[in-house]
């Protein structure tokens, strides 16, 4: 069996076998992870943030994602764990002085070195291109290489001096195992936050009840309110009449308090003549007119 030109085909050219799985280029994958936003697929530009799983985002893209209330969000699965802006940390990155960016190959006649990175480790000097493991601190956002944290063991950040714990260290663009560990940490953190809120609620209720009790039973106040003195005749009569009433209510049987007279006071004679206890009021019926009364009752 031949073809034009006298060629004899082989069997593997005629029989189609199973398709080979296409392998992803590792260099292209690293470039995509470390130079492009996971959410918008755009080039990373400051401010750059990272989530609790160690993925890199543009802060503008995260804000737009959170503000988008539509049911179908683009690439929502990549950021489904981000519920608020508090779930991301703004990174403090150190620039690489050897990185030229687009300025080095403006004409397109040079080879682009994909291994050259924009940022480096401020301690060791390793480039953040995916060849070395990098991590950041959730408390302050400083980025270091994992080698720097292992070689210089400290409980304080090497750049800003902020204290941190092991849970605050998050690996950037880690493996599947690293992502599983970070997911378990996220769940533990959220459980702690819920328990903290539940414990705060009864404390707030107790403080509110104590404040209500204190308002109902106030203590003695030493502040004197500046009220004007009452100078009218009616108010003075009320004061004189209220003294024996209060004494009788409290069970006080002193004769002086019960039989107090206006004649004992130091007021003027004109003022004393207004009351029935004055000598001018003790006249006989013949001396006083029948239509004149000194009080609300008749003699």
From Swiss-Prot:
Its main location: nucleus. One of its GO terms (molecular function) is DNA binding. Residues 226-240 have a biased composition (Basic and acidic residues). It is found in: Chromosome. Keywords: Chromosome, Phosphoprotein. One of its GO terms (biological process) is cellular response to hydroxyurea. One of its GO terms (cellular component) is nucleus. InterPro entries: Rtf2, Rtf2_RING-finger. The modification Phosphoserine is found at residue 280. It holds the Pfam family Rtf2. Undergoes proteasomal degradation, via DDI1 and DDI2. Removal from stalled replisomes and degradation are required for genome stability. It comes from the Eukaryota. The keyword Phosphoprotein applies. Residues 195-271 are annotated as: Disordered. Replication termination factor which is a component of the elongating replisome. Required for ATR pathway signaling upon DNA damage and has a positive activity during DNA replication. Might function to facilitate fork pausing at replication fork barriers like the rDNA. May be globally required to stimulate ATR signaling after the fork stalls or encounters a lesion. Interacts with nascent DNA. Interacts with DDI2; probably also interacts with DDI1. PANTHER family: PROTEIN C20ORF43 HOMOLOG (PTHR12775), REPLICATION TERMINATION FACTOR 2 (PTHR12775:SF0). Belongs to the rtf2 family. This is Replication termination factor 2. It comes from Bos taurus (Bovine).
């Amino acid at each position: 069996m031949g073809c034009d030109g006298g060629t004899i085909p082989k069997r593997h050219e005629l029989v189609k076998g199973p398709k080979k799985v296409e392998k992803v280029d590792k260099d292209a994958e690293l470039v995509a992870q470390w130079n492009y936003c996971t959410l918008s697929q755009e080039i990373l530009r400051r401010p750059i943030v990272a989530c609790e799983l160690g993925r890199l985002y543009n802060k503008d893209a995260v804000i737009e994602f959170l503000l988008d209330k539509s049911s179908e969000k683009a690439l929502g699965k990549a950021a489904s764990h981000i519920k608020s802006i508090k779930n991301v940390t703004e990174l403090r990155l150190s620039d690489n002085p050897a990185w030229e960016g687009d300025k080095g190959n403006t004409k397109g006649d040079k080879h682009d070195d994909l291994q050259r990175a924009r940022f480096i480790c401020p301690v060791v000097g390793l480039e953040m291109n995916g060849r070395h493991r990098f991590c950041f601190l959730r408390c302050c956002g400083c980025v270091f290489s994992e080698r720097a944290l292992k070689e210089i063991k400290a409980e304080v950040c090497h750049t800003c001096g902020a204290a941190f714990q092991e849970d605050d260290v998050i690996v950037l663009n880690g493996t599947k195992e690293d992502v599983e560990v970070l997911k378990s940490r996220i769940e533990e953190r959220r459980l702690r936050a819920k328990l903290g809120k539940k414990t705060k609620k009864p404390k707030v209720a107790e403080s509110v009840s104590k404040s209500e009790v204190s308002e109902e039973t106030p203590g003695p106040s030493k502040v004197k309110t500046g009220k004007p003195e009452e100078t009218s005749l009616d108010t003075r009569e009320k004061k004189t009449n209220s003294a024996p009433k209060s004494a009788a209510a409290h069970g006080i049987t002193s004769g002086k308090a019960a039989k107090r007279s206006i004649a004992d006071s130091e007021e003027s004679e004109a003022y004393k003549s207004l009351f029935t206890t004055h000598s001018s009021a003790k006249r006989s019926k013949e001396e006083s007119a029948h239509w004149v009364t000194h009080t609300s009752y008749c003699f």
